[in-house]
């Protein structure tokens, strides 16, 4: 199944639902960053969460940054997701590996750490990003993002994200976000019903591995609540904005002395993008041209 995002409503618009399949993009991140099993699960959950959060934004070019800094050996992670369906991200320690947790699953909470903070920055394109910080509740990513939605945005929310990875790579990755909108938030029975149904699920990836599609998952959860699945299917993908031109721009900011030192010591420069792992090589000729440009600007 292709990576995709779909939206739906239920209860006469009182419930907003979003679902994401992110298997291929999580696999691309795993390969690019050479991620361990648990690092793959952590970053995959975070990238899926980023896409789910970005899906509610309205203005073209809007993006969401999720940064998690816990006390675990993963060393934190950072995700950048857009309303356009693009996402990228990285972890501090891609090779970290831990024994399974008490449930026999990948110990994402242990890798991330249970003491720390989740930082969310929403950039809606007006030049004034909105930022919020909440304490981690479990380090499992999904619980922490749901906690952010409830405490910072005061929106009753259920968020379920998951990644299944084995020796062959990422087999399944994705998630769903259910939110009770303000006009229905006082309906305690509706909120309780949603919590109960989501709580009965054993996870998100088992549904995908069983062959369930996103519409079928929504039907299972919301079918008797006036479910309306919106017709648009949005493709989502791992995508980075880095380029050789940006690398040259960053090198130029180092100044003439530093560039000259690179030429003399290394005969060039190498830069690696943290978000996607792409390696860029700037030759002696490139650096010499940057120095000439700087001299021309100062002259």
Swiss-Prot record:
Belongs to the HSP33 family. HAMAP family: HslO. Under oxidizing conditions two disulfide bonds are formed involving the reactive cysteines. Under reducing conditions zinc is bound to the reactive cysteines and the protein is inactive. GO terms for biological process: protein refolding. Keywords: Chaperone, Cytoplasm, Disulfide bond, Redox-active center, Zinc. Pfam families: HSP33 (PF01430). The lineage of its organism: Bacteria, Bacillati, Cyanobacteriota, Cyanophyceae, Oscillatoriophycideae. Disulfide bonds join 240-242, 273-276. One of its GO terms (molecular function) is protein folding chaperone. This is 33 kDa chaperonin. GO terms for cellular component: cytoplasm. InterPro entries: Heat_shock_Hsp33, Heat_shock_Hsp33_C, Heat_shock_Hsp33_N. It is found in: Cytoplasm. Redox regulated molecular chaperone. Protects both thermally unfolding and oxidatively damaged proteins from irreversible aggregation. Plays an important role in the bacterial defense system toward oxidative stress.
């Amino acid at each position: 199944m292709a990576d995709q995002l779909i939206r739906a409503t239920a209860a006469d618009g009182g419930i907003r639902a979003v679902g994401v399949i992110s298997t291929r993009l999580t696999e691309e991140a795993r390969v690019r960053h050479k991620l361990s099993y648990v690092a793959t699960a952590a970053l995959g959950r975070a990238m899926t969460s980023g896409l789910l959060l970005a899906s509610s934004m309205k203005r073209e070019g809007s993006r969401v940054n999720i940064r998690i800094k816990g006390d675990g050996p993963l060393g934190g992670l950072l995700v950048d997701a857009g309303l356009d369906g693009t996402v990228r991200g990285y972890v501090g320690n891609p090779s970290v590996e831990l024994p399974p947790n008490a449930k026999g699953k990948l110990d994402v909470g242990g890798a991330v750490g249970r003491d720390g903070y989740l930082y969310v920055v929403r950039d809606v394109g007006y030049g004034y990003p909105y930022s919020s910080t909440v304490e981690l509740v479990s380090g499992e990513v999904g619980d922490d993002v749901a906690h952010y939605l409830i405490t910072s945005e005061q929106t009753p929310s259920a968020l379920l994200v998951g990644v299944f990875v084995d020796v062959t790579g990422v087999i399944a990755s994705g998630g769903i976000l259910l939110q009770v909108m303000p006009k229905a938030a006082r309906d305690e029975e509706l909120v309780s019903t949603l919590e109960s149904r989501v709580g009965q699920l054993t996870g998100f990836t088992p549904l995908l591995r069983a062959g369930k599609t996103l519409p079928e998952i929504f039907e299972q959860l919301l079918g008797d609540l006036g479910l309306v699945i919106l017709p648009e299917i949005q493709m989502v993908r791992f995508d980075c904005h880095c380029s050789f031109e940006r690398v040259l721009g960053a090198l130029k900011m180092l100044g003439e002395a530093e560039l000259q030192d690179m030429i003399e010591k290394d005969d060039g420069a190498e830069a690696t993008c943290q978000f996607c792992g792409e390696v860029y090589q700037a030759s002696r000729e490139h650096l010499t041209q940057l120095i000439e440009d700087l001299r021309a600007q100062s002259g």
